[in-house]
Structures are given as C-alpha cells and as structure tokens.
C-alpha cells in the first residue's frame, strides 16, 4: 500500500462535521477510505488539512501493519466459524439457488458456489471495499473499521465488520447489513 497523502483525499462538509474520502489500495484491492471528523464548528480548509495530516501518520502506520496481518484475520474468521456460516447461508433458501444437475452446487448472482466453501475460495472472494474511522483535531483516531463483502455474495447483502487496532491487529465484530 502506498503512503496516503493529504492530496489523495476529497473533503466534504455534512450535518455532523466533515469527512475525508480517498480510494486506496488495501490488501491489493481498490478500497474506499472514509475519515469522519465530527464538529459543529466551521473549520478552514487549512485547519482541516492540518488535522488530516496529523491523523494520516497513524492511519498509514496501522494500515501498513494490517496488510501484513491477513493470515491473522483469516485465522480469526475460521475460529469464529465464518467459513462454515457462509456455507449455511448459501444453502439457506434465501441464499443460493440449488443447481439440481450438480451435487453441492448453488448459484449466487450467476456464479456457481460449491459447498462446503473452502478456506481458499472464502479468502479469494473477500472484498475490502469500505474502510473508515473517526479522527480528532489532535490527530488521534479510533480503531479502523473494515467492512468485508464477498463476491459471490455468500451473506446475501451482509458484510463482516472488523476492526483494526493501533498495532494492525484485526478483531471481528460480526455480521452487519
């Protein structure tokens, strides 16, 4: 992942303050990074860029460490039974469509999915599409949230919400959506 710079971000105002967005390369995928800065005050562009700059030092460091921790994330997802849960969701009547001509085969969005889902197929299907955190005027940040979706969509429009701590370690919050 390349180091994120101030100029990589667009800054927009919303009802709760400001947010900064950038498209980044994370885990060798295109992801959207969203940073929220909650304030009721009017803040100049110079001040906003200063706040962003202070936060980016930590964010760059955390994301760099997290990219090296994909095996730790996969171990967590396996321990918390998400690969088996994906298989259950695919087989569920609201999940995939059973292909009658093939054993243990289901269609999801015109993709054939064979059950049980393997760890390799589960990992290949992961998308790190949305990443976000709150930032503060002193440069501090909250743990980073990562929303993992899947292609094919094993969890019928849901994602797995994870957090990345300051050391780049993952924790799993659960299904969201």
Label the predicted regions.
Residues 64-154:
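Amphipathic protein-protein interaction modules
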Residues 1-20, 120-177:
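Acidic, proline/glycine-rich low-complexity IDRs
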Residues 1-104:
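N-terminal "domain-start" segment
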């Amino acid at each position: 992942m390349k180091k994120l710079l101030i100029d990589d971000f667009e800054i927009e105002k919303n009802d709760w303050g400001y947010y900064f967005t950038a498209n980044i390369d994370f885990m060798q995928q295109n992801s959207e990074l969203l940073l929220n800065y909650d304030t009721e005050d009017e803040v100049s562009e110079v001040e906003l860029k200063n706040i962003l700059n202070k936060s980016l030092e930590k964010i760059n460091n955390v994301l760099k460490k997290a990219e090296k921790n994909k095996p730790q994330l996969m171990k967590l997802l396996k321990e918390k039974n998400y690969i088996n849960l994906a298989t259950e969701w695919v087989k569920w009547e609201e999940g995939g469509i059973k292909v009658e001509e093939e054993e243990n085969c289901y269609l999801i969005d015109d993709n054939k999915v064979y059950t049980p889902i393997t760890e390799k197929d589960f990992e290949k299907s992961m998308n790190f599409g949305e990443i976000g955190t709150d930032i503060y005027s002193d440069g501090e940040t909250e743990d980073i949230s990562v929303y993992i979706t899947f292609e094919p969509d094993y969890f019928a429009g849901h994602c797995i919400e994870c957090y990345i701590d300051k050391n780049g370690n993952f924790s799993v919050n659960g299904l969201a959506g």
